[in-house]
Amino acid sequence: QGFNPHLYMTFPLPLALGVESLREAVDFRLVQQMDFQRVADEMAAVLPPGFGVVEVAAPVMPASAIAWAEYEIRLAYPEQEREAMLFALKGLFDKPSIDVVKKTKKGETLTDIRPHAALLDCKTDENGLWMWVRLAAGSTLNISPQLLLEAFQKNTRPADSVKILRTAILDAERKPFA
């Protein structure tokens, strides 16, 4: 420790800029034994408005267990375009491959994200086009929802607005990360 103690805190799957989440995991070390309810109360007292503590628990899985993330994505389109966009979305997932340019620290690579992306559901309503997807996530392979949207918008026009909500973080067996 010395004169400058270091904080141990990690976010196993940090959110990308512009993505919301129902629940986020954070792993941190305490320097003394504390009741979980006290930890939750003390954290909640110093969080910014709009943030809350859902649960405090001992870690069950290592961060390396994360394999998937599920998202709810809403794309705003005018009413007259929604059915065509729904058709285009289903067509994208009917393809055997979905090639995108993925940017990494080593440069850009052409990547087929189709084996690592599943369309769970989709629909249109008065708010636009909705899709629920499962994408590979974690330390070995991470497919961002923005990459999927780039692939979708290659052959369509950009949405008037986009809302991305991460709804779950899952392990390889698709069990909730804990």
Q: What is the predicted function of each stretch?
A:
Residues F28-M34, I73-E79, V133-A137:
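Short beta-strand-to-loop capping motifs
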Residues H6-L15, G50-P59, L110-K123:
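Short amphipathic beta-strand starts and helix->beta connectors
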Residues V26, Q37-L47, E55, E72:
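Extended, solvent-exposed, turn-rich assembly/linker loops in the middle of proteins
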Residues R38-L47, A84-D94, L147-L149:
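Short amphipathic alpha-helices in soluble, non-transmembrane regions
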Residues F51-D94:
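Internal, conserved structured core segments that host functional sites
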